[in-house]
Design a protein with these regions (language model features):
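Conserved binding/recognition cores within well-folded domains
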Residues: 1-61
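C-terminal structural segments of small proteins and small subunits
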Residues: 57-60, 67-70, 74
Length: 80
């Protein structure tokens, strides 16, 4: 559903379980298909098909509000 950077780890949140991996957000971003996942903040990568709602400031996935960084505005509209 989404990936959150936590210092030198990433937290991978899925429908059923959360995982922690020791890698950078950039490393995991390079492994993901760009048509399915987008980085919307320096600390967050999201699965586009899991977006429940969004506005100019944040995306909602699994009832969690994820901020959209200033440099990433417009990515959601272009991707959907």
């Amino acid at each position: 559903c989404y990936i959150e950077s936590q210092k030198e780890y990433v937290k991978i949140v899925t429908q059923s379980k959360d995982y922690i991996a020791k890698m950078s957000t950039k490393e995991i971003e390079e492994m993901l298909p760009t048509n399915l996942f987008k980085r919307i903040h320096r600390s967050f990568i999201i699965a586009l098909d899991k977006i429940e709602s969004f506005n100019a400031e944040m995306v909602e996935i699994k009832e969690v509000n994820i901020p959209i960084g200033r440099g990433y505005k417009g990515i959601i509209e272009k991707s959907l």
